[in-house]
């Protein structure tokens, strides 16, 4: 769509007139149901402690212990999971394989979605070959426009360019966040799924939201509001949390 002149999050009147399109109302409830079906399918092959639910449609899976179990290579195991999801939901999924969480995410975002088999693979050497000079920087996970513009001031327009900036300057510009930027510029990511599961924040809050397609009356908004509260209560139970404020 970008090649046709449609920017991300464009409004309808901003779409070029020569492009034909359909407007379809979102069905978030159905989206969540399919997401749950996909997650349930994955759990037939891997244990929940080896899965990190990153978003409603993305999961990180540590497949290391399953390679000898299923006697498959990483790509073969990925294909097995893709086939299982397709058979269960009729959804064509994509997979990014990497030797750490960052490389797996980048393999998904930049390589897998353009691969004929919907699978992307990166290790440290392939990262330097295929990703180091990739532009724009905003395609890279966790680099938004603000961070990219600040890096441009130092002449960095790709990850390789970041490695050319003295680390002292990066720490002065970004503070402690420079450590993450530097690690990712070299294709490193020390955090593991086990680390994520073991993390316990000192303060924790949870929230849900729902986009309404029109203005609701008080009576109408009661039902979705109640559903949101009930979902939050269930999430509190899962994390064994308590609250005195909603």
Model-based region annotation:
Residues 152-246:
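DNA-contacting surface of Y-family translesion DNA polymerases
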Residues 1-183, 193-195:
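Gly/Gly-Pro- and Ser/Thr-rich, intrinsically disordered tail segments characteristic of DNA damage-repair
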């Amino acid at each position: 769509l970008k090649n046709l002149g449609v920017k991300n999050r464009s409004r309808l009147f901003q779409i070029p007139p020569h492009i034909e399109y359909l407007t379809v109302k979102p069905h978030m409830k159905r989206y969540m149901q399919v997401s749950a079906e996909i997650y349930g399918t994955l759990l037939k092959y891997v244990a929940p402690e080896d899965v990190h639910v990153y978003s409603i449609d993305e999961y990180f899976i540590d497949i290391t212990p399953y390679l000898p179990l299923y006697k498959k290579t990483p790509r073969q195991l990925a294909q097995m999971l893709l086939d299982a999801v397709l058979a269960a939901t009729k959804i064509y999924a994509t997979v990014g394989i990497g030797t750490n969480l960052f490389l797996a995410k980048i393999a998904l975002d930049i390589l897998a979605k353009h691969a004929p088999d919907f699978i992307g693979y990166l290790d440290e050497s392939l990262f330097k070959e295929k990703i180091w000079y990739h532009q724009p920087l905003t395609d890279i996970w966790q680099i938004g426009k603000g961070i990219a513009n600040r890096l441009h001031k130092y002449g960095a327009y790709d990850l390789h360019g970041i490695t050319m900036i003295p680390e002292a300057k990066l720490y002065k510009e970004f503070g402690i966040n420079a450590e993450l930027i530097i690690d990712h510029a070299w294709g490193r990511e020390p955090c593991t799924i086990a680390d994520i599961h073991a993390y316990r924040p000192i303060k924790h809050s949870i929230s849900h939201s729902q986009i309404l397609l029109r203005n609701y009356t008080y009576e109408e908004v009661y039902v979705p509001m109640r559903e949101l509260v009930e979902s939050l209560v269930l999430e509190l139970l899962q994390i064994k949390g308590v609250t005195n404020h909603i």
